[in-house]
A protein has these predicted regions:
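Conserved N-terminal phosphate-binding loop of PLP-dependent enzymes in the Aspartate aminotransferase
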Residues: 1-144
Length: 144
């Protein structure tokens, strides 16, 4: 199942199945109270149109590459994991000080259950210059 961001703020959920399961489902096999609501489905369509028209998938690929390249030579950064705009930056020590200092620079990041991993979860429309700013702040913090 998935839900987040499908409707750009309008509550929507989805259930994805593989081809094997899909071939066994027939029309009207499943019933829902709110399934297929017109407003929700219009929001989903508009979201997918915006993703396609604004080239957000290609942008996410560019953001991932820029993030990896920008952080490759920053001391203290052990590695970058993830795909597209959903990345985990692994440090050689706890990342909590970075998380707090980035927040002071108005850069919001996420923490992880792994204390050395900082989560970067920008929107798909993030610009590469914003990633450069993130990397430069990390570098400044590392050199401070």
């Amino acid at each position: 199942t998935l839900a987040k961001s499908l409707g750009s703020g309008v509550p929507v959920g989805a259930c994805l199945v593989n081809e094997n399961i899909s071939s066994k489902l027939k029309l009207n096999d499943l019933g829902t109270t709110f399934g297929g609501g017109m407003i929700a489905m219009a929001a989903v369509c508009a979201t997918f149109e915006a993703i396609e028209q604004d080239g957000m998938i290609a942008n996410a690929t560019a953001v991932e590459k820029r993030s990896r390249d920008s952080l490759a030579n920053v001391s203290g950064v052990v590695g970058v994991r993830g795909k597209g705009c959903l990345l985990g930056i692994e440090f050689d020590g706890p990342c909590k000080p970075y998380h707090e200092k980035l927040l002071n620079h108005k850069i919001i990041t996420g923490t992880s259950s792994t204390p050395n991993v900082l989560r970067l979860l920008p929107p798909l429309c993030v610009k590469t210059d914003e990633i450069d700013l993130f990397a430069s702040v990390i570098s400044e913090l590392e050199n401070a």
